[in-house]
Regions:
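Glycine-/small-residue-enriched transmembrane alpha-helix faces in small-molecule transporters
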Residues: 1-40, 148-175
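Hydrophobic transmembrane alpha-helices of multi-pass small-molecule transport proteins
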Residues: 50, 115, 124-144, 252, ...
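C-terminal transmembrane-helix exit sites in multi-pass transporters
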Residues: 54, 89, 109-133, 256-275
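Hydrophobic/aromatic residues within transmembrane alpha-helices
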Residues: 27, 38, 42, 92, ...
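Transmembrane alpha-helices of multi-pass small-molecule transport proteins
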Residues: 31-84, 165-169, 187-206, 222, ...
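Membrane-interface helix-cap regions at the ends of transmembrane helices
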Residues: 26, 46-67, 137-150, 194-216, ...
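Specific transmembrane alpha-helical segments of multi-pass solute transporters/efflux pumps
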Residues: 20, 58-99, 141, 222-242
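Helix-helix packing/entry segments at the starts of transmembrane helices
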Residues: 12-14, 41, 82, 86, ...
Length: 292
């Protein structure tokens, strides 16, 4: 039962993350706002959403989790996956383009596997490894574009750091949850840390909002936050029940969901490569799920 709940949570986390990405792309197409401004607003609202959920479920909020030394792994994971990963991703796109960046950062599930085996002593089955390899191959082919770049090695370095940062989050969060932190508490620490870090960044760079905002923007932001928060909660449930390797492999199905939602809501054009690579990714997810 625990594994079935974890698998369902992992798959649904990908669905809601894909929906969130589609909404964010729509926001950026309509409004001239920086990703960091949206990230700050997102994290700020998500903190109160989490506090409300925790109060409803547990009747109180244990703020001592923020001073517990065992929470340090979540804080490190939040900094790696949030501001550091995001900055490196943006620099990689700047130097080598979005296609190559997406292809390189697609290895982050493999990073989770390696780190989980080394630091958590997790045993990873051959089917999980095969599934993750299929997913990475599918994403790589789907996003790769032959681009002439002058600063390839610099861009490659930033993309690789981004993949390592993203892959580290699930392992560090898993470690924290093995030390008596539940999923909601772990996620609350993550969001508070991420918000404060982004706040520092925009204090130096500015908020980056160069357009007038309206009620529609507010509605889209709320929809975006809700989608992402549902995804985060489900993802952390999957990490806690399945171990980082399998949870990451299921979560990365967001790539396919993003394509589906983009086709429905923004009219994304479909080609043979997109269909074939999506099927490869789905096959990889199926292999991971069928292990049970």
């Amino acid at each position: 039962m625990k594994n079935k709940i974890g698998i369902s949570a992992g798959l649904l986390s990908g669905l809601f993350w894909g929906l969130g990405l589609t909404i964010s792309a729509y926001i950026f197409s309509l409004y001239n706002v920086s990703p960091f401004a949206v990230a700050v607003i997102h994290d700020f609202i998500s903190i109160f959403v989490l506090l409300a959920i925790i109060l409803v479920k547990y009747k109180k909020v244990n703020f001592r989790i923020f001073t517990n030394i065992k929470s340090i792994s979540v804080i490190i994971g939040a900094l790696l996956a949030g501001p550091i990963g995001m900055q490196c991703n943006l620099y990689a796109v700047k130097y080598i383009g979005s296609g190559l960046t997406s292809s390189i950062t697609a290895i982050y599930p493999a990073v989770s596997v390696i780190l989980a085996v080394i630091f958590l002593k997790n045993k990873v089955s051959s089917k999980t490894i095969i599934g993750i390899v299929l997913i990475i191959v599918g994403i790589f082919i789907q996003s790769y574009k032959s681009e002439q770049v002058e600063s390839f090695y610099l861009g490659f370095m930033f993309a690789l750091i981004c993949a390592i940062a993203w892959g580290s989050e699930s392992v560090l969060s898993s470690y924290a949850m093995k030390n008596n932190l539940n999923e909601l508490e772990t996620l609350l620490i993550r969001q508070v840390t991420s918000f404060l870090a982004y706040l520092v960044i925009i204090s130096f760079n500015g908020l980056g909002i160069e357009t007038s905002l309206d009620v529609k923007f507010g509605g889209l932001i709320v929809f975006f936050v809700v989608s992402n928060m549902v995804s985060y909660i489900l993802y952390y449930m999957a990490i806690n029940r399945l171990e980082p390797a399998k949870a990451t492999g299921l979560n990365v199905s967001y790539v396919v969901w993003t394509i589906i939602f983009s086709m429905i809501f923004v009219g994304l054009a479909v080609n043979v490569q997109l269909v074939v690579t999506s099927l490869i990714i789905i096959l990889g997810v199926y292999v991971i799920v069928r292990e049970e």
